[in-house]
Every structure is written in structure tokens, then in C-alpha cells.
């Protein structure tokens, strides 16, 4: 994940390279949900970690990575229940302009454009949008990449050994988007993933899942 994010300097620090925009690199906080696969337990874990981040402020905590291993085998529920519930919870708390949420999963697969039009929160950009960006940024690569491979390359950017919720500062996300346009960043990441290759990356992912605690 850090290899695809230009602002994550290591597994412990994020916000790298944004000092000119007023962002101070700060620690990444890691947490683990022990809710046993229950939505109520997951939400308690999410808000406990988020409250720590809010209390620490941007200089004390750059982001939160909350692992939820009990949800590793429940991709359908992860995007069908957890994503929408997180959205409602954050918006109900009046923090929609304060926090950015990104969700990861071992089996992440970007939903279709129709679903994303209703439930964009936390998801990867649609394959259709990635196609437009890639066609602008790297026409030759776009021409030789079919839709199924592009969908995989986009989905792979949200794969992780465990189900995971990444909590970020919305203000810092906006600064990052201003510094590096989305179409450039995501096209670069698609190229990296495609260069590594589907077979090799899926092999590495399988090993990560085997080794996870």
C-alpha cells in the first residue's frame, strides 16, 4: 500500500512531501477490531480509534489503519453493510468534511459504476473513470489494457491481507489531490500494478493471506 501512496514514507509515518502545503508528517496509528465480526463491535472499534485521531490532531496522528480480521471472508458484507454504515455514521457525526475513509479487503473488487453512483464512499474509482484517466495520461498503455485487466489493476490497489479501514484527514487528502492530480496518481499506480503482473501479485497476495496472524 505504501508503495502506491507517494505521501506514505514508511509503515509508521504519513504526510511525507507535503510540508510546503502546511502538512507535517505524523505517526500512523494502528488498531485491531476485536468485535468478532459483529457490526456493533466494529463500529465501536472504528470510533475509538477515530476519537484518538481527532484528539491527537493532524500533527499528532496522520491517519488510522484499523484491521478487522473477522471480516476477511465477508467481502459482500464488507462493502454491502460496512461501507454504507460508515458513511452514515461519519456524516451523522458532522465529520464528512473532517475525515476521509478508505476501505480495503483481501477480496476487494471495484463495484460497477451504477453502484458507485449511489455508494461512492470509501471505494476505488470506477473502471470507466480509470479508463478515461489512463487514456489521457498514457494512451499506449490504455490501448493495450482491456477492461477486465484494468478492473483488476484498480481493484488490486484496495487489496490488503486483512479487511481494513483507513481513516484520513479530509483536508490533507484535498491538499494531496491539489499537489498531484488524481488522473496522474491513479494512472501511475495502474502502470505499476500492470508492470508487476497479475499472476505475480496474486501469488504475493496469497502468501500474505497465508502468513497473516
Regions picked out by a protein language model, each given a short descriptive name:
Residues 1-213:
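Expand to "…catalyze enediolate/carbanion chemistry for C-C bond making/breaking, isomerization
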